Design a protein with these regions (language model features):
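N-terminal type II signal-anchor transmembrane helix
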Residues: 1-50
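Soluble, non-transmembrane domains of envelope/secretory-pathway proteins that act on or interact
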Residues: 7, 245-261, 519-780
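Non-catalytic, structured segments within soluble enzyme domains
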Residues: 25-26, 113, 117-294, 329, ...
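A short, well-structured edge-of-sheet supersecondary motif
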Residues: 44-57, 74, 306-338, 432, ...
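Active-site SXXK
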Residues: 81-83, 87, 235, 292, ...
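Short, well-structured active-site flanking segments
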Residues: 91-100, 173-176, 339-342, 365-383, ...
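Conserved catalytic neighborhood of penicillin-recognizing serine enzymes
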Residues: 107-134, 261-274, 370-425, 468, ...
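A penicillin-recognizing enzyme superfamily signal
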Residues: 282-305, 313-317, 328-331, 336-345, ...
Length: 780
């Protein structure tokens, strides 16, 4: 179309007016504050692995892939190539190139081929303000806005904004997004052929689409290659040294379409996207992530006949006071709606079952309640209205603390938890970052067995403190996060070390022997078989595995040691086989921890009568250590009558002096212990030993607890005392009121009639006595 001379004159007049006003407005515009050009369009978020490999690129709010990249982070050839191809006079014109504009008008006036006159700034104005530049008014507005932009922003900012908003085909805008979408690399790492390719696409993004493999794209790809060849010819003339790249530029270039963008570690990226934006380089190790995903998927497929359909896993690397996320699997299949696959097992609140027991023992170590070989009682016990049972329904009698932990015995754990104070287990969890806890009274001692809920991330952080010397580490999932040091101390270094040592003796489920290299691990099974857990500390890593259903459907197969532990060790073995988690358990050796020989049967310092000793860790000045009184010498004359001491023709034998309830447990287990013949003149045995274990001790109700009962349907309180083997009966009193008589080692039920404080007194038939203060609260 040819323009008439009057039309040309009017257009030139308008252009001169725009140029004049633009020049006059420069001073004013420069003095005004302005918003960054990066804020004119919504941005995508790119989440990458620690290696820089893209995990996920989100769409911006307007449905475009757009990722802002500073000009300094682009290869220097890219802006230079774009200016060479699009706007050689960019640094000289004020936003509108009068020479190019006049030439374009002349060519249009004489009816020749249309010649572009848009500068980089004009193209930026069109992109920013969505202008229709096909009609003269739109074109005039574009030029006015270009002058305005030049007046307000530097050439650096304008060029940077153009490269971040330029069209690259489909819904891809800007160099940052185009480099990730098409070439799977950050803009800073673009090769010379890739730079030359991206430099020519914005001029005609429809005709110069990157080859994506579809049958109709060949012609479009040819148009792109021709444009790139023209640019390269100009480039080599301008930069002769780059002629060495000519073969690479001439070679076919491969690119992926947006449909093939990665969608890796979806639960992990979902979690990051809630708080992060822009370019986010995470701490995720893609090799470890893929290994964990592969093993987990294969395990679920193999166990599907048991109804095991879903699982999650979290791998943390502990060091420098932080727990760094290395692998993160929120479900067996993110896209499977049948298992609610988009629910995140790492952040979901679930019952941990017995997985909190190591911290009960850790607190007890710090509070001087036990050492690993302290003998605990695994026997029927009522803690007020709470009467825990073991998973197998059986009781083992006397058991060492470390064995009770490894075998996950419930009654000893609850008994130890009942003795904790400042902090209690509840206070430990509260300070340890477990969120949404109800009141301590709501849980009571059931918290020790999984009565509360934790997330996998929260539980992993607690186990990570065992590797961090007892200090609670921060969870780190973004590489740029400043490492936090000096986290709150929840356990001592000594306690953390000993707990890991105890857990490392837990035998693998497949071999029946402790793992080598060492793995300190624990399982958990929630009530109703809703959750199966397994947690391991190995090398400098913490690995957590959960199996269950998000709809809370129970399954008898959901047992920690049977369902979760095999998956746990398959992952550990695979990581070690690939060299991704090699090495023995990394533990700090506190100088104040020592080894000591104790009597194997009692856990106390061995007296001369103790037949067998074992070595254990203890914390000097804190661990309870006393001389054992379990084994004692008993003397017999030639006629096999008991005598009270050594003498001519007197032999000595060693007897174990267990309390009455323990003797009963041994009998019920089919392992009765022999008891020495009674002789009132000889007391309870001869030194070494003494008679402490023969004294009467009230063991139920517990000291310091408030017993709350329903007034209409109260449950009887269990009254029980430990007595010596020679005791036959125990008599119970509430104040001066007689309650009843119980055989030695047996429980007497008692129903208080009103709320208040009671003084309970137990007296045995040999004169032994003990008292216990008790508070009872009857509620409607």
């Amino acid at each position: 179309m040819r323009l008439s001379r009057p039309a040309i004159r009017r257009l030139l007049g308008s252009l001169l007016t725009i140029l004049l006003l633009g020049t006059l407005g420069v001073g004013l515009a420069r003095s005004l504050s302005h918003v960054p050009l990066s804020s004119f369009a919504p941005q995508s978020t790119a989440v990458s692995a620690q290696s820089g490999e893209l995990l996920r690129l989100t769409l911006a709010a307007d449905g475009q892939y757009r990722l802002w990249v500073d000009l300094e982070r682009m290869p220097s050839r890219l802006p230079a190539a774009v200016l060479l191809y699009e706007d050689r006079w960019f640094y000289l014109h004020p936003g509108v190139n009068p020479v190019a504009l006049a030439r374009a008008m002349f060519e249009a006036g004489v009816g020749r081929r249309r010649v572009g006159a848009s500068t980089i700034t004009m193209q930026l104005a069109r992109r920013m303000y969505r202008l229709n530049t096909r009609d003269p008014r739109g074109k005039l507005r574009q030029m006015a806005l270009a002058l305005w932009l030049e007046a307000r922003y530097s050439k650096h900012d304008i060029l940077e904004a153009y490269l971040n908003l330029a069209p690259y085909g489909r819904n891809v805008e800007g160099v940052g997004a185009a480099s990730l979408v098409y070439f799977a690399t950050p803009a800073a790492h673009l090769s010379v052929p890739q730079v030359m390719t991206l430099a020519v696409i914005p001029q005609n993004p429809r005709e110069r689409r990157l080859r994506s493999g579809d049958a109709n794209s060949r012609k479009l790809a040819d148009g792109l290659e021709e444009a790139r060849a023209r640019l390269w010819a100009r480039w080599v003339k301008a930069v002769p040294d780059d002629a060495r790249f000519s073969a690479a530029v001439a070679a076919p270039i491969s690119a992926r379409p947006p449909e093939q963008l990665p969608f890796a570690a979806p639960h992990f990226t979902d979690a990051l996207l809630r708080s992060a934006a822009g370019e986010v380089q995470s701490t995720l190790d893609l090799a470890r992530q893929r290994t964990v995903e592969r093993i987990l998927t294969k395990y679920i497929e193999g166990e599907s006949q048991l109804g095991i359909r879903n699982a999650g896993a979290l791998l943390l690397e502990v060091g420098g006071g932080v727990a760094t996320v290395r692998a993160y699997v929120g479900s067996a299949d993110y896209r499977d709606a049948r298992i609610d696959g988009q629910v995140n097992a790492v952040t979901a609140k679930r019952s941990p079952g017995s997985a909190l027991k190591p911290f009960i023992y850790g607190l007890a170590l710090d509070q001087g309640l036990l050492h690993p070989r302290t003998i605990l009682k695994d026997a029927p016990t009522a803690f007020g209205p709470f009467s825990p049972e073991n998973f197998d329904g059986r009781f083992m009698g006397p058991i060492a603390a470390e064995d009770a932990l490894i075998r996950s015995r419930n009654v000893p754990a609850v008994a130890v938890a009942s003795q904790l104070s400042r902090p209690t287990l509840y206070e430990f969890l509260q300070v340890g970052g477990v969120s949404r806890l109800k009141s301590e009274r709501h849980y009571g001692l059931a918290l020790a067995l999984g009565g509360g809920e934790v997330s996998m991330e929260e539980l992993g952080r607690l186990y990570a403190l065992l590797l961090n010397g007892g200090r609670l580490p921060a969870i780190r999932s973004i590489l740029s996060q400043e490492p936090m040091t000096g986290g709150v101390r929840l356990l001592s270094e000594e306690s953390s070390f000993i707990v890991l040592d105890m857990l490392s003796k837990n035998p693998r489920p497949d071999t029946g022997a402790p793992a080598s290299p060492a793995v300190a691990w624990k399982t958990g099974t929630s009530w109703g078989f809703h959750d199966a857990w397994s947690v391991a500390v190995f090398g400098r890593y913490v690995l957590l595995v959960w199996i269950g259903n998000f709809d809370n459907t129970g399954n008898p197969a959901f047992v920690g040691v049977q369902a979760a532990a095999p998956l746990l060790f398959r992952i550990i073995d695979a990581l070690r086989a690939q060299g991704l988690a090699a090495g023995d358990l990394v533990r700090r050796f506190p100088a104040s921890v020592a080894r000591i020989e104790v009597c194997a049967a009692s856990g106390d310092l061995p007296n001369p009568a103790c037949p067998q000793t074992v070595s254990t860790w203890y914390i000097p000045g804190k661990s309870p250590i006393r001389l054992s009184t379990l084994h004692r010498y008993v003397y017999f004359d030639a006629a096999n009558h008991r005598v009270c001491g050594p003498g001519p023709e007197v032999r000595q034998e060693v007897y174990e002096f267990w309390t009455s309830d323990m003797l009963r447990l041994f009998r019920e287990a089919g392992m009765p212990r022999r008891t020495p013949p009674a002789d009132p003149d000889c007391g309870n045995g001869s030194e070494p030993g003494g008679s402490d274990s023969e004294a009467l001790h009230i063991v139920s109700p517990l000291r310091g607890l408030v017993y709350t009962e329903r007034a209409l349907h109260p449950a009887p309180l269990a009254l029980r005392a430990d007595v010596g083997a020679a005791t036959h009966a125990v008599y119970w009193f509430a104040g001066n009121a007689f309650i009843g008589r119980a055989p030695a080692g047996e429980t007497l039920p008692w129903l208080p009639q009103q709320s208040g404080r009671y003084t309970l007194r137990a007296v045995d038939d040999r004169g032994g006595a003990d008292t216990r203060e008790l508070e009872v609260e009857l509620v409607p």
